[in-house]
Amino acid sequence: INFATLSKFFAETLAVAEHILLRPAFPEEELRTYCAKRKQRLTIDRTKVDVEAREAFARALFGPQHPYGTSYDEAEYDRLTRADVVEFHRRRYTAENCFVVCSGRIGERERQAIAALAERIPHGGATVPAAFPAPVTEHEAFVGHPGAVQSSLRIGRLLFPRQHPDFLGMQVVATALGGYFGSRLMRNLREEHGYTYGVVAAMVNFEREGYFAVATQVGTDVTRAALQAIYDEIERLRTEPMPAEELEIVKNMMTGEMMRILDGPFGIADVTIENILCGTDNASIGENIRRIRAMTPADVQRLAQRYLAREELVTAVAGAADPRQA
């Protein structure tokens, strides 16, 4: 739950926070309106190849029975009751399951008021982490969408969460591939071939898992060519050392983005929350910058060779025609 306010309205905002945390009403009519809107939004989203590819990619990575690979349908909103929401709040919104992050102009008076509210959050025992099944990965997935003029592509693989020592290095690899406008995939797919308006590559972090992914949308007629271009760029990172000048640009992009995010109370709060959830603190920011600056072309090639072998990649496509049959 996030609250942002001007300092002069701190007391009024804290009163609203207290009501939401300690005495939520969950009015039946408002709940039904919310569910109807979310159901309609989901119905609309399911008509888009981008959403279909994203869900197919998650199922392929983790398996349909894994929490990270499960997709819910519109009927779930019809089954949700006010009693379900009240019970979820009672079990999950407890002192053992929460922490408070404050940023901005927070004085001693404000800090004490926030601490007093936090102390009033009911105790209920820490939630026992759910048992996750082992991921069951399929390497290819296709979702047919008759009449679609574009195909949505996802290529990647299951790797590791942020706590892994190679996560940051793989962020450098992903940035070089598709993390900024002048990245390799942008130059290849957009500037050289005109297959797409944009392509992105990133490392994605969950609490218990993490993965590497490339995502883009292309014209149906160039689906196979675009897939091959992505495979080729990944393979080029594995077989050819990256020029030092290019790597320096990548490093500057990453460290500059980190500084931009930290420029202000909202970004500082977001980074702090992520660090707490990942079991670290803000002291890791400086260490991460140091590690990024220390990356060499050999490091990039080594990581690409270790983690991005073609046979390990998962490919998901949503569109009018299955590229495997073309």
Where in the sequence are the language-model features?
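Charge-rich, well-structured scaffold segments of protease-associated domains
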Residues: 1-126, 160-161, 169, 191-326
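His/Glu-based metal-binding/catalytic segments typifying zinc-dependent metallopeptidases
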Residues: 125-183, 317
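Short amphipathic alpha-helix segments
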Residues: 184-192
